[in-house]
């Protein structure tokens, strides 16, 4: 018997079935960088409209975690999709290089500055350490397939960037936003420095809970105001969880509109907010109480009470922050240790106490508590309160308390002389709030979030008492502490030196070089700038300076949702203060990475997944696909199981691509492409399907909805292609003549689809797209890399006069699904095996009957059965199925199985020269080839 295998057009491609991404990706990366891919993209994009995504700088310390991977991959997807949409998309990655975490790490290696090593040597060690960290992190970002100007990133410790940061400070001063003052700031005892709002985390802490008596100075005056008597001494009762602040108490705050009660409590009288009398009585375990009288808070102003253990008295003052949500309605006020306390104390001309030093200990002249660390002093304060009879009740409470984000230790509010950007100076708060409304926030709830934060944020303390940071580079008068009158000129001179020598130039600077004779009256400000000032000013030091950005405002900032109070906030404050406008047009935020149960990644739980583990095992494309397929607007769940699911989705996409490529074997577009109006109907429909998918995918990319891109891509690969079109065309691809219209029409469709598909996936599955690109049929003038291409423009829609329109094929899909259901039943009943063993009779109602008749004898190819007959539903001898108006009968196909096409036919053996195969195959092997019109 003749072997007809060689007469078939079997699929063939060098594109492997298995991705083996972990092995193949590094070689692709090497090729990208050997060929300078990023610069190729820049070159081909020259002259196009620019889209600027300004990279928020990760901190140059430690290993990358999945949050870093999510962030950089999202940015890369956007940049690549924007390139494909016709934009010039320069991407300059950056790093945040100054600040405490690096100092602490370097201290552990070389010791503290000015102890074992000079400050200058320490700064150099910090610079070298940061460079090492940048190199490590950079290698990992590159391994993820992220394209950018990795050879020329921006570092906040680059000399030119440090100089630009100083110039931004000069603009802040020039515009009247800077002032010096003593205000309570978040202070970390371990850092020995103030903290920014964004560096504060809230964790549960167990603290003492104390109710304290402040005995009245004039009991008669109080009896008169309340118009009540009673028995025993009178006290105002406060509640606090920070006993260590009691030595700094300078007032008691009450609300003028609240009602206050004079309460008989056993053998003493106490003042409490009326609403809270019952809850306080319960908390202090009072057996009984009697409200003697009540008055409005406004009548009690300036009553005075003895400090619990110091020989001075403190007044009642009004404060709008006083509520009845807890406590006693009378608020212990220590101006050094709380923002509200500070504000109302200043309003009432009450001085701060200044009892705590930079080391977090009571100063040597503080009575009873000299030298004690603040938290250690709690018990001593409680003992003193007991000793003086001021302690009404002691308990313990677990509550949310501010902690340092680095040390994970409790912090304090502490008043220190610092430099601030004033939120009310020159209308900065109002300006920033107005700018928020001009920005597109994605998701849109981000607008309300940052609006609330800006509306309520305190003045920004920008000074730090650190060694490794950009200096404030100012001189102040020895006596008045006023800035030198030539401060702006001096800052520019310093900036010019820093541009050449780095920040050490400031500490090496002899004041006489810039001040002349004034040098004897002025001294250098020793502080460095908050690192949030460094990163917050990159709109000026990077976006306004790099030539590829053309001085434009950034189109987008993209970071995690914690950056509303971090980088988004600091950038907005500085840009509003210096330029009078927001530094960004769009802000996109993504959620945090959690495990499948919604828990944070934690070594103690054992749920940490390291990015390098993923790409070393599965490949970076699997990591990228997980990022893209996850809705980033919420928490992003990940586990090994979830990554395996991403692997399954990847295989579906890869298998689709492989089918397309393997069936383009021998297809040369310039020679073999079939014009749209000459293509077979089903092929035209497949291309129009791809166009519809492309429109959806491009729209999803434009709206940054990457999970929608993946869903639409999967639908196209699995439903429209995998379970319908690609299944149907196998017979035509494999069995018709190699150069027949039937086959070339199909190959033309597959080629268009492959050209489109590779561009759709390139922003997400970058390595796989590069691999597919290298296996596509050669086209003259084709770029070497898919990443320099735009979305495919040669897809076409169905002709408006085409009777077999999209609606027609959608109905055919539904009919075929019903036929497949009945075929599956027949298989289960052992009536048939494969679908080609079947003869189906389709009984259709008046609406569907003409649809099926249009295909004539080619209906069987759509249904993938050997025979298909169409009859009116009225003739049916089987019941309707799940599709109304349709009944399907399945019988065994007539005739024998053709060994070449596997269809059953009754004419096998009737052709003398080819008596083993069916007449259709004879025509394809020895004749002119069968003619197809529809499928």
Curated annotation (Swiss-Prot):
Motif ('HIGH' region): 58-68
Assigned EC number: 6.1.1.5
Cofactor descriptive note: Binds 1 zinc ion per subunit.
PROSITE patterns for the chain: AA_TRNA_LIGASE_I
Subcellular location as annotated: Cytoplasm
Binding-site residues for ATP, renumbered to this chain: 603
Chain residues that bind Zn(2+): 898, 901, 918, 921
Motif ('KMSKS' region): 600-604
GO cellular component: cytosol
One BP term from GO: isoleucyl-tRNA aminoacylation
Alphabetical list of Pfam families matching this protein: Anticodon_1, tRNA-synt_1, zf-FPG_IleRS
GO terms, molecular function: aminoacyl-tRNA deacylase activity; ATP binding; isoleucine-tRNA ligase activity; tRNA binding; zinc ion binding
Keywords attached to this entry: Aminoacyl-tRNA synthetase, ATP-binding, Cytoplasm, Ligase, Metal-binding, Nucleotide-binding, Protein biosynthesis, Zinc
Top-level taxon: Bacteria
Required cofactor(s): Zn(2+)
Assembly mode: Monomer.
Family: Belongs to the class-I aminoacyl-tRNA synthetase family. IleS type 1 subfamily.
Function: Catalyzes the attachment of isoleucine to tRNA(Ile). As IleRS can inadvertently accommodate and process structurally similar amino acids such as valine, to avoid such errors it has two additional distinct tRNA(Ile)-dependent editing activities. One activity is designated as 'pretransfer' editing and involves the hydrolysis of activated Val-AMP. The other activity is designated 'posttransfer' editing and involves deacylation of mischarged Val-tRNA(Ile).
UniProt cross-references to PANTHER family, sorted A to Z: ISOLEUCINE--TRNA LIGASE, MITOCHONDRIAL (PTHR42765:SF1), SOLEUCYL-TRNA SYNTHETASE (PTHR42765)
Protein name: Isoleucine--tRNA ligase
Organism of derivation: Haemophilus ducreyi (strain 35000HP / ATCC 700724)
Gene designation: ileS
């Amino acid at each position: 018997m003749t072997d007809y295998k060689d007469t078939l057009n079997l699929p063939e491609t060098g594109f492997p079935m298995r991705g083996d991404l972990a092995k193949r990706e590094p070689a692709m990366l090497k090729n990208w960088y050997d060929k300078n891919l990023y610069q190729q993209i820049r070159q081909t994009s020259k002259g196009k409209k620019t889209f600027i995504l300004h990279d928020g700088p990760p901190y140059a310390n430690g290993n990358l975690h999945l949050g870093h991977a999510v962030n950089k991959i999202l940015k890369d997807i956007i940049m690549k999709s924007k390139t494909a949409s016709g934009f010039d998309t320069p991407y300059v990655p950056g790093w945040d290089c100054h600040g405490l975490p690096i100092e602490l790490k370097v201290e552990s290696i070389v010791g503290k500055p000015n102890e074992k090593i000079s400050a200058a040597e320490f700064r150099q060690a910090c610079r070298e350490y940061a460079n090492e960290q940048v190199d490590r992190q950079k290698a990992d970002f590159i391994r993820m397939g992220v394209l950018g100007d990795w050879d020329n990133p921006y570092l906040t410790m680059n000399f030119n960037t440090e100089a630009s940061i100083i110039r931004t400070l000069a603009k802040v001063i020039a515009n009247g936003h800077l002032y010096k003052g003593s205000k309570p700031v978040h202070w970390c005892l371990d850092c020995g420095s103030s903290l920014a709002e964004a560096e504060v985390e809230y964790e549960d802490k167990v603290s003492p809970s104390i109710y304290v008596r402040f005995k009245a100075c004039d009991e008669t005056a109080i009896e008169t105001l309340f118009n009540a008597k009673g028995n025993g001494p009178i006290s105002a009762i406060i509640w606090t969880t920070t006993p260590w602040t009691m030595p700094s108490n300078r007032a008691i705050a009450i609300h003028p509109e609240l009602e206050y009660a004079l309460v008989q409590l056993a053998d003493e009288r106490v003042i409490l907010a009326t609403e809270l009398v019952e809850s306080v009585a319960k908390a202090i375990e009072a057996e009984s109480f009697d409200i003697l009288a009540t008055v409005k808070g406004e009548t009690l102003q300036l009553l005075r009470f003895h400090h619990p253990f110091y020989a001075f008295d403190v007044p009642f003052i009004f404060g709008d922050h006083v509520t009845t949500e807890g406590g006693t309605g009378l608020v212990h006020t220590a101006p050094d240790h709380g923002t509200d306390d500070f504000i109302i104390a200043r309003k009432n001309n009450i001085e701060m106490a200044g009892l705590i030093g930079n080391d977090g200990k009571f100063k040597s002249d503080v009575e009873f508590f000299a030298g004690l660390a603040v938290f250690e002093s709690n018990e001593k304060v409680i003992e003193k309160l007991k000793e003086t009879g001021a302690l009404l009740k002691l308990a313990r409470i677990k509550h949310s308390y501010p902690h340092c984000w680095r040390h994970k230790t409790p912090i304090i509010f502490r008043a220190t002389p610092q430099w601030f950007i004033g939120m009310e100076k020159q209308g900065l708060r109002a300006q920033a709030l107005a700018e928020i409304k001009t920005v597109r926030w994605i998701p849109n709830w981000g607008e309300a979030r940052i609006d609330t934060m800006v509306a309520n944020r305190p003045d920004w303390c920008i000074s730090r008492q650190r060694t490794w940071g950009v200096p404030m580079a100012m001189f102040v008068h020895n006596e008045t502490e006023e800035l030198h009158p030539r401060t702006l000129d001096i800052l520019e001179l310093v900036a010019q030196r820093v541009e050449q020598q780095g920040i050490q130039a400031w500490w090496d600077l002899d004041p006489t070089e810039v001040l002349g004779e004034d040098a004897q009256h002025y001294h250098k400000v020793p502080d460095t700038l908050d690192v949030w000032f460094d990163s917050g000013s990159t709109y000026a030091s990077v976006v306004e300076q790099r030539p590829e950005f053309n001085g434009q405002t950034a189109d987008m900032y993209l970071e995690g949702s914690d950056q509303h109070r971090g980088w988004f906030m600091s950038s907005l404050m500085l840009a509003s203060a210096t330029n009078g406008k927001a530094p960004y047009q769009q802000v996109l935020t993504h959620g945090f990475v959690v495990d499948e149960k919604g828990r944070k990644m934690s070594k103690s739980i054992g749920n940490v997944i390291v990015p390098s583990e993923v790409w070393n095992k599965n490949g970076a494309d699997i990591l990228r696909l997980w990022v893209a397929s996850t809705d980033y607007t919420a928490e992003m769940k990940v586990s090994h199981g979830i990554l395996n699911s991403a692997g399954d989705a990847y295989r579906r996409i890869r298998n689709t691509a492989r089918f397309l490529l393997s069936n383009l074997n021998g297809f040369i577009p310039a020679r073999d492409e079939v014009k749209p109006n000459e293509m077979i109907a089903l092929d035209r429909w497949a291309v129009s399907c791809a166009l519809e998918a492309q429109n959806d995918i491009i729209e999803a990319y434009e709206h940054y909805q990457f999970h929608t891109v993946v869903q639409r891509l999967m639908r196209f690969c699995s439903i429209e292609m995998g379970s319908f079109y690609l299944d149907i065309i196998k017979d035509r691809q494999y069995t018709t003549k190699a150069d027949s219209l039937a086959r070339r029409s199909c190959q033309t469709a597959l080629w268009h689809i492959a050209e489109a598909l590779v561009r759709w996936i390139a922003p997400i599955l970058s390595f796989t797209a590069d691999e597919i690109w290298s296996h596509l049929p050669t086209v003259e003038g084709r770029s070497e890399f898919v990443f320099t291409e735009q979305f495919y423009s040669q897809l076409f829609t169905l002709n408006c006069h085409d009777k077999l329109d999209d609606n027609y094929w959608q109905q055919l899909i539904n009919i075929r699904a019903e036929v497949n259901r009945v075929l599956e039943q027949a298989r289960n009943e052992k009536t048939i095996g494969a679908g080609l063993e079947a003869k189906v009779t389709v009984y259709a109602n008046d609406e569907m009957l003409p649809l099926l008749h249009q295909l004539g004898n080619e209906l069987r190819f759509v249904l993938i059965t050997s025979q298909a007959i169409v009859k009116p539903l009225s003739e049916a001898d089987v019941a309707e199925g799940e599709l109304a108006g349709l009944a399907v009968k399945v019988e065994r196909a007539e005739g024998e199985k053709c060994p070449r096409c596997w269809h059953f036919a009754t004419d096998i053996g009737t052709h003398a020269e080819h008596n083993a195969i069916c007449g259709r195959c004879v025509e394809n092997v020895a004749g002119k080839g069968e003619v197809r019109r529809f499928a």
